[in-house]
């Protein structure tokens, strides 16, 4: 009996702990399940508008919706809210699909709001017949003026109570293209004194004589976002419509529209909002991102300094690192500023696990091993990734003349300098122990060549007594004879302040970092020729890099993803 009681207590404790670990959206879903929603009725969607490239802010919505789909084994639709033909293009549809797939998620169906244009139109006609919508012939500026403000009641349109037959006739003629853009609109008849401005007879349709990327010139009128969005959710039977906090005030309108078409027995979708993700030193306004491109601050949507998913991918961020970042940020109800250092931390943490280790010298100086036979070369074995047991090894060439980093040598240095100096020893990574002997300088006194000797019995991994000898420093190198030239692009923050668009009266372009990119020429081991574009790499002792799409057979370009180390630790 005692065992049963203890088991029940333990079970309750575990259930309470599980409940505490749920975020507020998961708790809403669990409550809905407890109140009769069937598990097989759970369905989500990610509904981007195809008018630009996805950015870091979208990754949160993607991860939340698809993550919930995985948690509840529920389908997630990728639905394009393509209701504005002025700004939407197939190029953006393709890039969005690529980004979602790259992040590691799979949708159930690809759908479009334009799939539902006829149904939305039919429902709008139904609302007109019921006296809940009317055609307004006033310009948009007048409509805006009549809405007033939250503390002042709005003014009703003189067309608000026109006969239903008139509105039906005009709406059909709007659809047929008989009227000019801006001359008429269809408005819902709700409440012109509501403190919620969205409820003051919102526009449902406007005239737009622009070709649509999917429907061509079939339609001359297009539904507004608020009308199309919730009804699309209803058509697809989305159980939980999740969006950012900016749409919280739109929820009453979302529900009002839904109430007009809802049929008993169907799933009644509910909108819930979560905090948007703002990351320091980044902007996500599409208009401002377009300005960066138009004014040649950056080189396109996939510039590695851009906060777009395509830019982050090109810079070398991994899908796992972004998903982990979103997981650490969590799902909150209040907006706050996320430190970019947390994103870098997640990227660095993942790259440490998966990046292949390679050798490259980004500020080269020649090193000649005087007692190594001229013309001789050998191939040495070195590990690909000590963090992965099955990563294996590779062969790298070694010869008499090498390149090392300029900062890895000093003619004279104290006891705390554990790199190469005259009279001092250092190990060449995966190779031999060498000793600095002398230098050669140009007419300006700059060192051009370092001369050293090597201990031929000290080869790494050979098992000799000399190879086991301990020296305090190990440096990387590349064989001068075999090295390939590499162009290294080091990226810094695009802006000099945490919130570049925080001040409304100051142009955000004033905060552009003039040193957001620097390009240097170096040398890399020959295997870098065959590295795939986008493959994560660690340039040993330097940082994490990836091969860029600008690479050619004669010019190998590598983007720095993040530095090797940082003092930042998440709280």
For every predicted segment, state its role.
Residues 2-14:
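Short, Lys/Arg-enriched N-terminal segments with co-localized hydrophobic residues
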Residues 20-30, 34-97, 213-244:
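N-terminal catalytic cores of NTP/NDP-binding nucleotidyl/phosphoryl-transfer enzymes
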Residues 35-39, 67-75, 99-109, 234-235, ...:
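Secondary-structure transition/capping motifs at alpha-helix termini
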Residues 47-50, 79-87, 109-118, 141, ...:
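Conserved short loop/turn motifs at secondary-structure junctions
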Residues 82-84, 90, 112, 126-289, ...:
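Active-site cores that bind ATP or allylic diphosphates and position pyrophosphate for catalysis
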Residues 92-117, 124, 131-134:
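A glycine-rich helix N-cap at a beta->alpha junction
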Residues 267-346:
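Long, charged, mostly alpha-helical binding arms that flank functional sites
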Residues 325-333, 337-571:
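Substrate/cofactor-recognition hotspot
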